[in-house]
Amino acid sequence: MDKVKFSPYETPGKMSYKVGLTGGIGSGKSTVAKIFSELGVPVIDADIIARELVKPGQPALAEIVTTFGREILNAQGGLDRSRLRHLVFTSEALKTRLEAILHPRILQEMKRRATRLSAPYCVLVIPLLVEIAQKDIVDRTLVIDIPDAIQRQRVKARDQLSDTEIEAILRAQSPRAVRLAAADDIIVNDTDLATLQRQVEHYHQKYLFLASQQRN
Protein backbone atom coordinates (compact mmCIF):
# COMPACT_ATOMS: atom_id res chain seq x y z
CA MET A 1 0.00 0.00 0.00
CA ASP A 2 1.31 3.44 -0.92
CA LYS A 3 2.17 6.00 1.71
CA VAL A 4 -1.01 7.64 2.92
CA LYS A 5 -1.94 11.12 1.76
CA PHE A 6 -3.63 13.05 4.56
CA SER A 7 -4.84 16.06 2.55
CA PRO A 8 -7.46 17.55 2.59
CA TYR A 9 -8.06 16.59 6.24
CA GLU A 10 -4.65 17.45 7.66
CA THR A 11 -5.83 20.44 9.64
CA PRO A 12 -6.53 20.98 13.33
CA GLY A 13 -10.13 20.47 14.34
CA LYS A 14 -12.32 18.07 16.23
CA MET A 15 -10.52 14.77 16.54
CA SER A 16 -11.57 12.15 13.99
CA TYR A 17 -13.45 9.04 15.05
CA LYS A 18 -10.85 6.28 15.01
CA VAL A 19 -11.50 2.82 13.57
CA GLY A 20 -8.87 0.20 14.35
CA LEU A 21 -8.44 -2.21 11.43
CA THR A 22 -6.85 -5.53 12.32
CA GLY A 23 -6.69 -9.17 11.31
CA GLY A 24 -4.29 -12.05 10.95
CA ILE A 25 -1.54 -12.29 8.36
CA GLY A 26 -2.97 -12.75 4.87
CA SER A 27 -6.47 -11.66 5.89
CA GLY A 28 -6.57 -8.74 3.46
CA LYS A 29 -5.89 -5.74 5.70
CA SER A 30 -3.98 -3.84 3.02
CA THR A 31 -6.73 -4.40 0.45
CA VAL A 32 -9.43 -3.23 2.86
CA ALA A 33 -7.35 -0.20 3.85
CA LYS A 34 -6.90 0.66 0.17
CA ILE A 35 -10.66 0.55 -0.39
CA PHE A 36 -11.24 2.85 2.59
CA SER A 37 -8.58 5.20 1.21
CA GLU A 38 -10.27 5.24 -2.20
CA LEU A 39 -13.49 6.25 -0.42
CA GLY A 40 -11.64 9.31 0.87
CA VAL A 41 -10.92 8.03 4.37
CA PRO A 42 -7.50 8.90 5.87
CA VAL A 43 -5.57 5.70 6.62
CA ILE A 44 -2.69 5.49 9.10
CA ASP A 45 -0.80 2.22 8.71
CA ALA A 46 1.36 0.84 11.54
CA ASP A 47 3.51 -1.17 9.11
CA ILE A 48 4.33 1.92 7.04
CA ILE A 49 5.27 3.83 10.18
CA ALA A 50 7.40 0.90 11.37
CA ARG A 51 9.36 0.96 8.11
CA GLU A 52 9.91 4.70 8.47
CA LEU A 53 11.13 4.27 12.06
CA VAL A 54 13.87 1.81 11.11
CA LYS A 55 15.40 3.74 8.23
CA PRO A 56 19.15 4.43 8.50
CA GLY A 57 19.82 7.23 10.96
CA GLN A 58 16.63 6.71 12.97
CA PRO A 59 16.94 6.18 16.76
CA ALA A 60 14.86 3.00 16.63
CA LEU A 61 17.28 1.37 14.21
CA ALA A 62 20.23 2.33 16.41
CA GLU A 63 18.50 0.71 19.39
CA ILE A 64 17.78 -2.43 17.36
CA VAL A 65 21.46 -2.65 16.38
CA THR A 66 22.46 -2.25 20.02
CA THR A 67 20.12 -5.09 20.96
CA PHE A 68 20.68 -7.50 18.07
CA GLY A 69 24.17 -6.59 16.86
CA ARG A 70 25.42 -5.15 13.57
CA GLU A 71 24.80 -8.45 11.79
CA ILE A 72 21.15 -7.37 11.69
CA LEU A 73 22.12 -4.79 9.01
CA ASN A 74 22.42 -5.42 5.29
CA ALA A 75 25.34 -4.34 3.10
CA GLN A 76 23.78 -0.90 2.59
CA GLY A 77 23.44 -0.25 6.32
CA GLY A 78 19.70 -0.80 6.34
CA LEU A 79 17.74 -3.32 8.37
CA ASP A 80 17.92 -6.92 7.14
CA ARG A 81 14.24 -7.69 7.59
CA SER A 82 14.41 -11.37 6.71
CA ARG A 83 17.16 -11.98 9.28
CA LEU A 84 15.30 -9.99 11.92
CA ARG A 85 12.10 -11.91 11.22
CA HIS A 86 13.95 -15.20 11.60
CA LEU A 87 15.44 -14.13 14.94
CA VAL A 88 12.22 -12.88 16.52
CA PHE A 89 10.18 -15.87 15.43
CA THR A 90 12.71 -18.29 16.93
CA SER A 91 13.13 -16.46 20.25
CA GLU A 92 10.29 -15.15 22.37
CA ALA A 93 12.76 -13.05 24.38
CA LEU A 94 14.10 -11.30 21.26
CA LYS A 95 10.56 -10.78 19.97
CA THR A 96 9.61 -9.10 23.24
CA ARG A 97 12.68 -6.84 23.11
CA LEU A 98 11.92 -5.79 19.53
CA GLU A 99 8.32 -5.01 20.43
CA ALA A 100 9.50 -2.90 23.37
CA ILE A 101 11.59 -0.83 20.96
CA LEU A 102 9.03 -0.39 18.20
CA HIS A 103 5.50 -0.57 19.60
CA PRO A 104 5.58 2.56 21.81
CA ARG A 105 7.11 4.59 18.96
CA ILE A 106 4.58 3.31 16.43
CA LEU A 107 1.59 4.03 18.66
CA GLN A 108 2.90 7.48 19.56
CA GLU A 109 3.31 8.38 15.89
CA MET A 110 -0.12 7.02 15.00
CA LYS A 111 -1.71 9.12 17.72
CA ARG A 112 0.22 12.18 16.56
CA ARG A 113 -0.97 11.76 12.98
CA ALA A 114 -4.55 11.10 14.04
CA THR A 115 -4.71 14.33 16.04
CA ARG A 116 -3.86 16.30 12.88
CA LEU A 117 -6.97 15.06 11.08
CA SER A 118 -10.36 16.71 10.80
CA ALA A 119 -11.99 14.02 8.64
CA PRO A 120 -15.18 12.49 10.07
CA TYR A 121 -13.25 9.31 10.78
CA CYS A 122 -9.91 7.69 10.07
CA VAL A 123 -8.69 4.11 9.87
CA LEU A 124 -5.72 2.94 11.94
CA VAL A 125 -4.27 -0.27 10.49
CA ILE A 126 -2.75 -2.13 13.45
CA PRO A 127 -2.03 -5.82 12.75
CA LEU A 128 -1.42 -6.58 16.45
CA LEU A 129 -4.17 -4.39 17.90
CA VAL A 130 -5.64 -7.27 19.90
CA GLU A 131 -2.25 -8.64 20.98
CA ILE A 132 -0.88 -5.35 22.35
CA ALA A 133 -4.00 -4.74 24.45
CA GLN A 134 -4.24 -1.11 23.33
CA LYS A 135 -7.85 -1.04 22.16
CA ASP A 136 -8.33 2.24 24.01
CA ILE A 137 -6.46 4.08 21.24
CA VAL A 138 -9.38 3.46 18.86
CA ASP A 139 -13.12 4.04 19.13
CA ARG A 140 -14.09 0.88 17.30
CA THR A 141 -12.36 -2.33 16.21
CA LEU A 142 -12.91 -3.79 12.74
CA VAL A 143 -11.55 -7.32 12.29
CA ILE A 144 -10.88 -8.84 8.88
CA ASP A 145 -11.69 -12.53 9.23
CA ILE A 146 -10.56 -15.38 7.01
CA PRO A 147 -10.85 -19.16 7.42
CA ASP A 148 -7.61 -20.78 8.56
CA ALA A 149 -7.09 -22.92 5.45
CA ILE A 150 -7.56 -19.98 3.07
CA GLN A 151 -5.27 -17.85 5.24
CA ARG A 152 -2.42 -20.33 4.98
CA GLN A 153 -2.89 -20.72 1.21
CA ARG A 154 -2.81 -16.97 0.62
CA VAL A 155 0.23 -16.36 2.82
CA LYS A 156 2.18 -19.17 1.20
CA ALA A 157 1.38 -17.91 -2.31
CA ARG A 158 2.06 -14.24 -1.49
CA ASP A 159 5.14 -14.38 0.72
CA GLN A 160 6.81 -17.60 -0.43
CA LEU A 161 7.27 -18.69 3.18
CA SER A 162 7.77 -22.23 4.40
CA ASP A 163 5.08 -23.97 6.42
CA THR A 164 7.34 -23.67 9.48
CA GLU A 165 7.69 -19.90 9.04
CA ILE A 166 3.96 -19.48 8.52
CA GLU A 167 3.18 -21.44 11.68
CA ALA A 168 5.67 -19.35 13.67
CA ILE A 169 3.97 -16.15 12.51
CA LEU A 170 0.51 -17.52 13.31
CA ARG A 171 1.63 -18.54 16.81
CA ALA A 172 2.75 -14.97 17.45
CA GLN A 173 -0.73 -13.67 16.63
CA SER A 174 -3.92 -14.06 18.60
CA PRO A 175 -6.06 -17.07 17.67
CA ARG A 176 -8.91 -16.35 15.30
CA ALA A 177 -11.50 -16.80 18.06
CA VAL A 178 -9.77 -14.23 20.27
CA ARG A 179 -9.71 -11.63 17.48
CA LEU A 180 -13.37 -12.20 16.71
CA ALA A 181 -14.27 -11.84 20.39
CA ALA A 182 -12.50 -8.46 20.44
CA ALA A 183 -14.27 -7.19 17.33
CA ASP A 184 -16.97 -4.56 17.20
CA ASP A 185 -17.38 -5.22 13.48
CA ILE A 186 -16.27 -8.07 11.21
CA ILE A 187 -15.53 -8.28 7.50
CA VAL A 188 -15.32 -11.82 6.12
CA ASN A 189 -12.80 -11.95 3.29
CA ASP A 190 -13.26 -15.42 1.83
CA THR A 191 -14.74 -14.74 -1.60
CA ASP A 192 -14.05 -12.07 -4.23
CA LEU A 193 -13.03 -8.42 -4.37
CA ALA A 194 -16.52 -7.20 -5.28
CA THR A 195 -17.97 -8.79 -2.14
CA LEU A 196 -15.18 -7.28 -0.07
CA GLN A 197 -15.84 -3.85 -1.60
CA ARG A 198 -19.52 -4.01 -0.68
CA GLN A 199 -18.70 -4.88 2.92
CA VAL A 200 -16.25 -1.97 3.20
CA GLU A 201 -18.79 0.44 1.69
CA HIS A 202 -21.36 -0.74 4.24
CA TYR A 203 -19.02 -0.01 7.13
CA HIS A 204 -17.98 3.28 5.57
CA GLN A 205 -21.56 4.51 5.85
CA LYS A 206 -21.83 3.12 9.37
CA TYR A 207 -18.66 4.90 10.52
CA LEU A 208 -19.74 8.18 8.97
CA PHE A 209 -22.92 7.91 11.04
CA LEU A 210 -21.09 6.97 14.24
CA ALA A 211 -18.63 9.81 13.72
CA SER A 212 -21.47 12.28 13.29
CA GLN A 213 -23.06 11.04 16.51
CA GLN A 214 -19.79 11.49 18.39
CA ARG A 215 -19.38 15.05 17.17
CA ASN A 216 -22.91 16.12 18.06
Swiss-Prot record:
Keywords: ATP-binding, Coenzyme A biosynthesis, Cytoplasm, Kinase, Nucleotide-binding, Transferase. Disulfide bonds: none annotated. Its EC number is 2.7.1.24. PROSITE patterns: DPCK. The keyword Transport does not apply. The keyword Nucleotide-binding applies. GO terms for biological process: coenzyme A biosynthetic process. It is found in: Cytoplasm. It catalyses: 3'-dephospho-CoA + ATP = ADP + CoA + H(+). Gene3D superfamilies: P-loop containing nucleotide triphosphate hydrolases (3.40.50.300). ATP binds at G26, S27, G28, K29, S30, T31. One of its GO terms (molecular function) is ATP binding. InterPro entries: Depp_CoAkinase, P-loop_NTPase. Residues 18-214 form the DPCK domain. PANTHER family: BIFUNCTIONAL COENZYME A SYNTHASE-RELATED (PTHR10695:SF46), DEPHOSPHO-COA KINASE-RELATED (PTHR10695). NCBIfam families: dephospho-CoA kinase. Catalyzes the phosphorylation of the 3'-hydroxyl group of dephosphocoenzyme A to form coenzyme A. Belongs to the CoaE family. This is Dephospho-CoA kinase. It comes from Nitrosococcus oceani (strain ATCC 19707 / BCRC 17464 / JCM 30415 / NCIMB 11848 / C-107).
